[in-house]
From Swiss-Prot:
GO terms for cellular component: astrocyte projection; axon; dendrite; dense core granule; exocytic vesicle; glutamatergic synapse; Golgi apparatus; membrane. Residues 137-146 have a biased composition (Low complexity). Residues 1-16 are vesicular. It comes from Mus musculus. GO terms for molecular function: calcium ion binding; calcium-dependent phospholipid binding; clathrin binding; phosphatidylserine binding; protein heterodimerization activity; protein homodimerization activity; syntaxin-1 binding; syntaxin-3 binding. The modification Phosphoserine is found at S135. This is Synaptotagmin-4. Ca(2+) binds at D246, S249, D252. Keywords: Calcium, Cytoplasmic vesicle, Differentiation, Membrane, Metal-binding, Phosphoprotein, Repeat, Transmembrane, Transmembrane helix. The lineage of its organism: Eukaryota, Metazoa, Chordata, Craniata, Vertebrata. The chain crosses the membrane at residues 17-37. Its main location: membrane. Belongs to the synaptotagmin family. Expressed in many regions of the nervous system but is undetectable in extra neural tissues.
Amino acid sequence: MAPITTSRVEFDEIPTVVGIFSAFGLVFTVSLFAWICCQRRSAKSNKTPPYKFVHVLKGVDIYPENLSSKKKFGGDDKSEVKGKAALPNLSLHLDLEKRDLNGNFPKANPKAGSSSDLENVTPKLFTETEKEANSPESLKSSTSLTSEEKQEKLGTLFLSLEYNFEKKAFVVNIKEAQGLPAMDEQSMTSDPYIKMTILPEKKHRVKTRVLRKTLDPVFDETFTFYGIPYPHIQELSLHFTVLSFDRFSRDDVIGEVLIPLSGIELSDGKMLMTREIIKRNAKKSSGRGELLVSLCYQSTTNTLTVVVLKARHLPKSDVSGLSDPYVKVNLYHAKKRISKKKTHVKKCTPNAVFNELFVFDIPCESLEEISVEFLVLDSERGSRNEVIGRLVLGATAEGSGGGHWKEICDFPRRQIAKWHMLCDG
C-alpha cells in the first residue's frame, strides 16, 4: 500500500499558518490596547474638574526677604522712593503668585521692576478698593467694631479675591497682616499664622505657614478652590482666624475677620481687600453643656463598662458655626493615666448622640483609686482640638461626679446613667 504523503504535508503547514495568525493577532491586540489608553488619557485631560473644593497652596517663600520688616500694600511712599534707588532682589524665593491658574508665567515686562506683587499694586487700584471697603454697603457686611475693640487694635489683614470662570476656580490670596499685638511677653513678638474656613459648610479649612518672631508677617499664600459655580460664591462667607503659635501650650488666638461674599462682584477681575482684625467673639453660653454617661462595675470580671450616650447644649466654638464634638475618655489610677479611648466625631451639632461603649480592666482592690475623665473636644482639622468641657468621675471627684461614682461602687453589676454639667477644661 502506497504511503499517504499529501496528508503529511498538510499537517506540516498547519503550525506555520497558526503561528502567522497568532503573531498578527498579538500585534492587533497590542495596537488596540495602546489606542484605548491614548483615548482615555486625552478624555481625562479634557474632563472638567468635579464639583468639590480642592485647595492649592501657592506663593510659599523659601527664604522670605525680611519677616520683621513692613511691606507697603498700596503705593510706595514717594518720599522714600525719591531718596533711595531700587535695589535688586537677591533673595531666593518661589514667586508663584505671579503664575496664572494654569501654572504658567506671564510674559516678562522689561519696564517692570523687581519688586514684589504687593508693591506693584498701583495707587489708583488701592484707592478704589479702599473706597469700596469704606462704602456703607461694605460697612454693613463687615463685622462691626465696639469702642473697646477699636481701642485694642489687633492689626489689619490684607488679602485678594479672584474668580476664574474658565476653570470654575475661586482664588483667595492671603497677602499679609500688619500691626499684630505681641503675644510673647518676654520677646515682645509673635509667631503668627492664619486659618481660613469657608462658611456655612465649615468643611474646608486651610492655614498658612507659621512665621517666626514678627508682628508684620508677609504670607503671600494662594488657596485655589476648584469646581465652585460663580452664583454659589454669593452664598459663602470667609472666616479668618489669626493665631500665634505656642510650642508648649495651646496656640494664642489674636483675633478674627469675617467676610460675607454676598454683594461682592468678582467678574471684573482680582479684588484687593483690607479688614481690621477684631477680638474673637466666642459666642459661648454661660454653661459648657451637659454629658450623659452610663457606668457599670462588674465585680466578677473586674471590668468597668463606660457608655458615652449623649451631649446637649454644647456651645458654639466661634462665629464660624457649630462645633464638631467628640469625647475622649481617660482612665486614671492614682493620678496616672493607664488607658484612653475616644468616640467618633459628630459633625456640626450642639446635641450629639454617641452611644459608644468602652470596657476597662480594673483590679477590685484599687477601685477607690480609680477615676474616669471625660473630655468633650471640638475637632479642628490641621490644628489642636479645643476642649469644650470636662467631667471627672471618681471617689475624690466633687459634685455629681463623686455621687455617681459612689452609686457605681455601692451597686455593682448595675448600669447607672446620669446627666452631668461640664466644667471648664
